[in-house]
Regions:
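N-terminal-proximal low-complexity accessory segments that begin disordered
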Residues: 3-68
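Elongated alpha-helical scaffolds
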Residues: 47, 186-241
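Hydrophobic or amphipathic alpha-helical targeting/insertion segments
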Residues: 144-152, 221-230, 234-264
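Surface-exposed intrinsically disordered loops and tails
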Residues: 133-138, 173-178
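A generic structural motif
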Residues: 77, 121-137
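Single conserved hydrophobic/aromatic residue that forms the stacking wall/gate
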Residues: 284-295
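Ser/Thr/Gly-rich low-complexity blocks that favor extended beta-strand/coil architectures
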Residues: 90-123, 137-166, 216-218, 225-229, ...
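Polybasic, proline/glycine-rich intrinsically disordered low-complexity segments
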Residues: 260-282
């Protein structure tokens, strides 16, 4: 599937037509170079890559190893919004990857992810997602206790402030503070999408913050963008000492792949590649993931 963005418009005028079988743009001395000719040169090469790629891969194929995963034991912990009068949302994300301990229970865990109320309408409290490492003081407690204070095993700095190891940095809600949510993950890789080989960054999404009885289609949302120097300052000319320094350069065509979830009844795949399907917490590999290569 070719890109959907039409570049044969002002100001790009990319009128490349594969039916004409033009394989090169032959620039000549004494003839001014047209902007469209520079763009068309790229389109000729892209058409060659797309023709080869389409012969090998189906749209949405994973080309360079990455992986998609589903976690239906994504342990959530709701925290009080402030600690000694300080809004914990100011610093809580600095604790991601850190080992924490419950002062009352003795339970140890590592913070994997943080979700704030302003980031997700389904969340009313600052919520951390943890992987539990050890049970508590009596070897029977496996989750943090409601209302208990938690400390970190190492110093954490935010701004000019340092929270020292062993200091209380947050407290759990007094009731129903712990539960089990669900999440999906994708690791870094390259996917063949719309004739291009697109880098995908490592991403994660919380499917359901406090329950793991999830039912969704999970995959990649495709966004095509035109990026100008106003969007990305690195596109201003960096040739310091020359007359064109700091002038806006050429625009860029960009494709971004973002991990998202869709309702299982949503069949609109116009800008979506399904990678897996979850039905009542049961995982099913999508047809697209099962058969991504040409036979």
């Amino acid at each position: 599937m070719a890109q959907k963005t039409n570049l044969n418009i002002n100001p790009y005028y990319d009128d490349f037509d594969p039916e004409k079988n033009y394989q090169k743009v032959l620039y000549k001395p004494g003839f001014p170079v047209q902007a469209r000719e520079l763009t068309t040169s790229q389109s000729i090469l892209q058409n060659q890559l797309e023709s080869f790629g389409t012969n090998i891969f189906k749209d949405g194929s994973l080309v360079v190893p990455g992986s998609i995963a589903y976690d239906n034991n994504y342990y959530s912990v709701k925290l009080k919004s402030s600690n000694f009068g300080i809004d914990i949302s100011l610093y809580i994300k600095n604790f991601i990857g850190k080992k924490i301990i419950g002062q009352t229970s003795g339970v140890e865990a590592k913070i994997r992810f943080v979700l704030l109320p302003e980031e997700d309408s389904r969340v009313d409290d600052v919520t951390i997602y943890v992987s539990y490492d050890t049970s508590g003081n009596d070897f029977s407690q496996t989750f943090f206790a409601d209302g208990e204070e938690i400390i970190c095993t190492e110093n954490v700095t935010y701004g000019l402030t340092t929270i020292n190891a062993g200091e209380v940095f947050a407290s759990l809600n007094t009731a129903d503070a712990t539960s089990v949510g669900s999440a999906a993950f994708i690791t870094k890789g390259v996917y063949f999408v719309r004739g291009y080989f697109i880098n995908v960054s490592e991403q994660k999404i919380v499917l359901d913050p406090y329950t793991n009885n999830s039912t969704y289609r999970v995959g990649l949302q495709i966004d095509e963008n035109i990026i100008t120097a106003k969007d990305d300052e690195s596109l201003f000319d960096n040739a310091k000492g020359f007359s064109n320094f700091a002038a806006p350069g050429a625009d860029r065509f960009q494709i971004v792949l973002t991990l998202i979830k869709k309702d299982i009844t949503d069949g609109d795949d116009t800008n979506f590649i399904e990678l897996m399907r979850i039905d009542s917490c049961l995982l099913y590999t999508s047809d697209a993931a099962d058969d991504l290569y040409r036979g």
